């Protein structure tokens, strides 16, 4: 296809229907690659080793962070008994905030070609912080906060965005498969880390040796990632200005509704993740069973993350799935008030894990839907994740304060249920704004990229007009992590 044809297509494309799996065809220079876009390796030793390294980083970074519920339980009952549950939750909240919130800065550094600096720097900081955590003494809150909250959180945050972004340098047609493998690392980590931590710090090894064992595992895996991951493209000659993207955000009401909704939703979303195991333990359930509540929830979350990709093949609207998943989480959090038996905890863990995993899987697609200029996608995702991180930072301490030292469980459950319900209203408002914007967009300007790389884009434009009119929100390729194309 000629350059002039590409320019015409870019000028007439509707921003919300751009297929992310094929967007690179339209703007190959955006990544600083001077070679034709059809020269993506789509495999090979270097590509799959990089995917393996990214999988490992997700396992060690976000997979570890989402296992904080084990520490919340252990610190509250045994190791930090002089601190309230609200104070203790600041450790996990700050850790999560840094993992997600640092992306707005780390992403810019990655765009400028500092991948290896970020990879080695984040790995060293994470390893050092976890070994320092093993030296923390009982009832010394500041030692644990500095090592686990700040150190490990910042180290994981430095690794998180680059481990996802690097995969796009090797894959286009098989990017969905590659990204699915990478994203499953965090789910596997959220499943296995609680098992290991409960068996070690609550077992014969104790806190110090158990933490060292976990730190040794993570350090060894991160070293493997550093040795096998490689970049393919040179640093780009031009990086889009962050200020221009932010100015566009201020005028985008749909994105504002989404960002505010994410901030509010995150305040309540992490309540079950941080407190479910402590809830099960303090209600007199068998300790061995209580240790598995997080494992059950995270195993179900893995299934929930795969579900949107399956439903999208049946043209289920992305926006509808997003609102339903947030609403499902809200209803289930209210349900925490009544769970008191083993069976109730199992049922809650399975259903909440499913909806929570589904919500996380849809974050990327819904943010892509809200991005008019594909070159601003990274900046907009950074802003949205920063809002999410702020909500996660506030949620743990607020819920801990409502819980009080007397463990009054209905208070944080009601509060978290209310805020997630309010967030769902914001997400519905976002969909209404998108719908109104669709109605004011001339149908002649709507375009999606070719569904298969072998068909001309012009033919796809003619054949997909009727599909776009029937389904305004289902967008082929907006689920790059879970949409399998071989």
What is the role of each PLM region?
Residues 101-115, 304-318, 403-404:
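Helix-to-loop junctions at the C-terminal end of transmembrane segments
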Residues 60, 64-75, 194, 247, ...:
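Extracytoplasmic gate region of multi-pass secondary transporters
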Residues 173-177, 181-233:
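Helix-loop-helix hairpin linking two adjacent transmembrane segments in secondary transporters
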Residues 68, 75, 149, 156-171, ...:
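Intracellular juxtamembrane helix-capping segments at the cytosolic ends
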Residues 55, 59, 129-130, 141-158, ...:
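Hydrophobic core of transmembrane alpha-helices in multi-pass small-molecule transporters
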Residues 101-142:
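Conserved MFS/SLC helix-loop-helix module at the cytosolic interface between two early adjacent transmembrane helices
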Residues 1-44, 432-486:
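Intrinsically disordered, low-complexity terminal tails of fungal membrane proteins
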Residues 117-131, 319-335:
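Structural signature of the two symmetry-related core transmembrane helices
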């Amino acid at each position: 296809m000629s350059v002039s044809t590409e320019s015409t297509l870019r000028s007439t494309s509707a921003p919300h229907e751009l297929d992310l799996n094929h967007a690179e065809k339209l703007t190959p220079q955006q990544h600083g690659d001077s070679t034709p876009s059809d020269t993506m390796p789509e495999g090979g030793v270097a590509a799959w080793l990089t995917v393996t390294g990214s999988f490992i980083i997700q396992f060690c970074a976000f997979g570890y962070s989402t296992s904080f519920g084990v520490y919340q339980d252990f610190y509250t009952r045994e190791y930090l008994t002089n601190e309230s549950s609200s104070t203790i939750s600041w450790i996990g909240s700050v850790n999560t905030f840094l993992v997600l919130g640092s992306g707005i800065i780390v992403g810019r550094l990655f765009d400028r070609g500092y991948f290896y600096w970020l990879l080695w720097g984040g790995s060293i900081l994470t390893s050092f912080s976890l070994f320092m955590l093993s030296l923390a003494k009982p009832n010394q809150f500041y030692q644990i906060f500095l090592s686990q909250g700040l150190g490990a959180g910042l180290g994981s945050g430095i690794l998180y965005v680059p481990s996802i972004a690097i995969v796009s340098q090797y894959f286009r047609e098989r990017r969905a498969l590659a990204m699915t493998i990478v994203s499953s690392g965090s789910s596997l980590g959220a499943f296995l880390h609680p098992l290991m931590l409960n068996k070690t710090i609550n077992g014969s090894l104790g806190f110090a040796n158990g933490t060292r064992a976990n730190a040794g595992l993570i350090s060894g895996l991160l070293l493997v990632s550093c040795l096998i991951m490689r970049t393919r493209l040179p640093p780009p000659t031009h990086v889009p200005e962050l200020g221009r993207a932010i100015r566009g955000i201020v005028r985008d009401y749909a994105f504002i509704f989404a960002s505010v909704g994410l901030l509010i939703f995150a305040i309540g979303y992490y309540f079950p993740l941080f407190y479910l195991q402590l809830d099960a333990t303090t209600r007199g359930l068998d300790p061995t069973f209580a240790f598995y509540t997080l494992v059950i929830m995270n195993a179900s979350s893995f299934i929930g993350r795969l579900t949107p990709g399956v439903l999208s093949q049946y043209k289920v609207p992305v926006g509808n799935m997003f609102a339903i998943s947030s609403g499902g989480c809200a209803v289930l959090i209210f349900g925490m008030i009544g769970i008191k038996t083993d069976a109730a905890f199992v049922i809650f863990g399975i259903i909440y894990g499913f909806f929570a995993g589904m919500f996380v899987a849809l974050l990327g697609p819904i943010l892509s839907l809200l991005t008019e200029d594909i070159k601003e996608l990274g900046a907009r995702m950074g802003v949205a994740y920063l809002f999410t991180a702020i909500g996660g930072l506030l949620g743990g301490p607020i819920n801990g304060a409502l819980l009080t030292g007397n463990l009054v469980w209905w208070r944080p459950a009601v509060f978290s249920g209310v805020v997630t319900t309010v967030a769902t209203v914001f997400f519905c408002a976002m969909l209404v704004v998108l719908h109104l914007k669709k109605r004011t967009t001339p149908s002649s300007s709507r375009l999606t990229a070719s569904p298969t790389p072998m068909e001309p884009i012009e033919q796809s434009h003619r054949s997909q007009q009727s599909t776009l009119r029937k389904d305004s929100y289902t967008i082929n390729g907006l689920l790059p992590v879970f949409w399998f194309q071989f």
